[in-house]
Regions:
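Soluble catalytic domains of enzymes that build or remodel membrane lipids, polysaccharides, and related
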Residues: 155, 160, 164-396
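Non-catalytic terminal accessory segments
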Residues: 1-150
Length: 396
């Protein structure tokens, strides 16, 4: 294999590792689940029932394989954006439902079995419990797609800043992030988010990345609607990873500037409020494979309140060491789909970052991570409703 082929293969592997891991993980869980069902609950079932179970498993494997092949062969790029997005989302949703169904079978087996000597009421209760277990996965995904995904709300969060200048006490900052305008989010949802933000009468309006999901999504429409944000000091922002994926970093910056929005790309904007200065800085998306915030420390302004906009929240420990008193981020969608068990929120995002949702502190420094507005991958939210965030600075 020559050098060119090896470079291409390495790039292909790195690009497809997340999807390959997801595909193999789901298929493995399905295979183990089917094997367990055939050996356990369906061991004495009729041949027709066992054949049906195997046929459904094969069909599921075929659908998941077809979706993965379409993706890695890049056939999906030739499909209409809405069909590509919803097709991929549906396959991911089915993967999620199928895994939950396997877990439901396990839970159902753990339930007591109805016996002839049991009362009719007990038999009915156990029957209802089994039905509820199997219906719950589909019901949860349906709720996430059709209800919670569209349940946009205002979230208010106070951020205590040690030694905050009195003229900055009570300063209101409104944040919109992870909009992902496209197949999964209509323009009217962006308009609604802007209307909610404007009702806060904020001093500063922020847009912290991922305006769209893919190349060809309606970026201009998103920018035009975001330009309707109103704030005393103006509209500022930073870019996210999807601006990079879509190749729109420069266009977003230039088109935003024409509309009155300033995207800060390794740059700072000192804002005066009375006798106080808020030094607002922003960085482009910080990649996992490179050191965070290289050279960003030089933007810190002594004597000012230093606030950093970074789409990726993982920069927080570095930002705190550099002297940024407050970091504002997005990227995680709050996990997008998460379940609370024993007062612990479980989500895929937990595997990638400690900073999933809300306010975190490290010494005197703080970071706020917003759940954002849109979705990616699967058009659903569960346990992580979309939000417009209103941040209030306050003295400790």
């Amino acid at each position: 294999m020559n050098t060119v082929d090896f470079a291409w293969l390495s790039k292909w592997i790195l690009r497809n590792i997340p999807d390959l891991i997801l595909f193999l993980g789901v298929v493995t869980i399905q295979a183990v689940g089917v094997w367990w069902i055939l050996r356990g609950p369906a061991a004495n079932a009729s041949r027709r029932v066992r054949t049906t179970i195997v046929s459904l498993a094969i069909a599921s494997f075929a659908v998941l394989s077809f979706g993965f092949l379409l993706h890695f062969m890049r056939v999906s790029r030739h499909l209409p954006l809405w069909l590509n997005a919803w097709g991929r989302g549906s396959i991911i949703a089915w993967a999620l439902i199928s895994v939950l169904l396997v877990l439901a079978f396990g839970a159902a087996e753990a339930l007591p079995k109805a016996r002839p000597e049991h009362s009719p009421a007990r038999r009915n209760f156990l029957r209802a419990a089994h039905i509820a277990l199997f219906a719950a996965p589909a019901a949860a995904v349906g709720y996430g797609v059709f209800i919670e995904r569209l349940d946009l709300r205002l979230r208010e969060q106070s951020i205590a800043i040690p030694g905050l200048h009195p003229d900055l006490n009570g300063l209101r900052i409104v944040q919109l992030t992870d909009i992902h305008l496209g197949a999964f989010l209509a323009e009217r949802q962006v308009e609604r988010a802007v209307a909610i933000a404007n009702e806060t009468r904020a001093h500063i309006a922020l847009v912290t990345g991922d305006l769209i999901s893919f190349q060809g999504d309606p970026l201009d429409a998103c920018l035009n609607r975001l330009a309707r944000l109103t704030a005393e000091a103006g509209i500022f922002g930073c870019l996210g990873n999807h601006e990079i994926y879509a190749g729109t970093e420069d266009y977003t910056t230039e088109a935003g500037a024409r509309l009155g929005m300033r995207f800060l790309r390794d740059a700072a904007a000192p804002l005066r409020f009375g006798d106080a200065t808020l030094n607002l800085a922003g960085v482009d998306y910080q990649h996992l494979r490179a050191p965070y915030l290289v050279g960003t420390g030089k933007l810190v302004r002594p004597g000012a309140l230093n606030v950093l906009l970074s789409h990726n929240p993982d920069v927080f420990p570095v930002a705190a060491r550099q002297g940024w008193q407050c970091t504002i981020a997005g990227h995680t969608h709050g996990g997008q789909v998460r379940v609370e068990i024993l007062h612990q929120n479980l989500s895929v995002a937990r595997f990638f970052t400690h900073y999933v949702d809300g306010l975190y502190r490290e010494g005197p420094a703080s970071i706020f991570v917003s759940r954002g507005i849109g979705t990616i991958g699967v058009p659903a939210r569960l346990g992580a409703p979309p939000e417009v965030a209103l941040l209030r600075l306050c003295r400790t």
